């Protein structure tokens, strides 16, 4: 319980300055709070790097920003109350009360989800070690720069995380709360889950302006990401940058951008730009992936109704301009990456790595249609409901569903578009665009249209469809795509979206009605499945490093020292202590000119064969860790700092 209180306090303190900035601008949304909080941290970190200072300066600057914004926030609250006319006050109260009721319900449900996530946190795994290592270095080093977080002493920046904004955010939470960074990464999702739910609701509210479909959209997002995969799904990784970008920052940016198409005020446009910048810094390609459906939305909105053209273009500019400025700074780093603008050998290697998700050959390819429905029953239902958006063409949600879906589907399914797109952003990233299909909104809006068409029959139909789809298409969540979703559902969505685009030209009132019960019953089987398998994932295995070894490295090895070990041990050592390493699994580090991860692995294999200490010394290592279970032949006449049944820590010296 104490740890939970610490984490809540830490996140609240770091988010508070952003909340005050957003309030000073008059934007009362969690989306704006998150966006401005990260922009404040971004500015504070940038100043810290320029001055080669420590995270103490970052924290002081973040808190100073909050103090500076507080008077303006109080003044803005008073002005808003004074300047409203009675008629506007009544109308605003009706809208605000409806929005607030839905947000309270979603926030409460998100809090319950967060507490449930505490029990399935399990162990750090996968990319978690990579990100945790960066947080450790930010907390430990006193002369920070953008290169301080590099895992290798002679390595370079990671193109996806060149500026460690989210890592800095987590490091500040750890510093303020006093919690161990490992606990922040493992249990941070408990605190972030309510925020994710509210942000999903705000994005739904911006599109629908009604409580029921907005709540349904938020619930569908949770079903797709947390319930369908079992074991908490990706929500257990909500403290990691990729998941945070997808489940927190992207809905925040979308909510603000859609609001800006309604009211393109300077405050909303600035907040949209702040969210876009934060998204671009935390996970660059996801900012680009947001532009694609948003442009599709604007084009369809233009074809169906013209009044939104100028506000829509302003909102798009707010999304693009700040992110593009960051991309200009990032471009030299991206240019050193093997997977961007790849040669023939690299493209063939990547194609073979993701072969199950691709159709075609290494020279021209697209994603397979099964990829769009791989997240299970809710995804399949959303694909089938998507065409019904054409019957509500006057609504913003319908334009976003049809336009966003067509934009994503065309890029992903047309080889002569998808191949150069993959060359530009890397195949590792481009295949993820399929996950940006607006499925949650398609389901939330489509079920309302279906309710208008078939009346009360929608309730048993929704329940039967939810059960049938969960049994037939439970989802395919492995790293390799084996079965995926039904291809026919994707083609129904493609054809239906085209038909919906044509149908939308007819000027007719939208066909839709509230469908709360039907929405709940459609999602219920997936929630039952998820909760029935609510256990820690076996994929995140216990840390093989012994507690004694970790304690010895933390106590004896200075921060920033270079430790040599096998790739798997090295990767984990950096996560538990602020040390540099010489080798890591190639799949978990950037394949850049400076990093050359595969060559490093080959060097370690030579060391394992020969025991030549010149190999670790060439990397600058002054400490050596040996896994005696895997490499019993490696024993050296060096000073032993720690020894247990499996691990030995040697002092290698200069």
Where are the language model's segments positioned?
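Membrane-helix boundary/interfacial segments in multi-pass membrane proteins
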Residues: 5, 54-59, 178, 229-245, ...
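Short hydrophobic alpha-helices at membrane interfaces in multi-pass membrane enzymes
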Residues: 259-277, 456-461
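Extracytoplasmic
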Residues: 9-12, 482-491, 506-654
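Active-site lumenal/periplasmic loops and adjacent helix-entry segments of GT-C-fold
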Residues: 102-248, 260, 531-542
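Hydrophobic, aromatic-rich transmembrane alpha-helices
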Residues: 376-401, 448-451, 497-506
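Membrane-interface helix-loop junctions at the exits of transmembrane helices
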Residues: 42, 116-120, 141, 215-233, ...
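Membrane-embedded, hydrophobic transmembrane alpha-helices
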Residues: 1-89, 94, 448-450, 454, ...
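Perimembrane helix-loop-helix junctions
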Residues: 90, 290-320
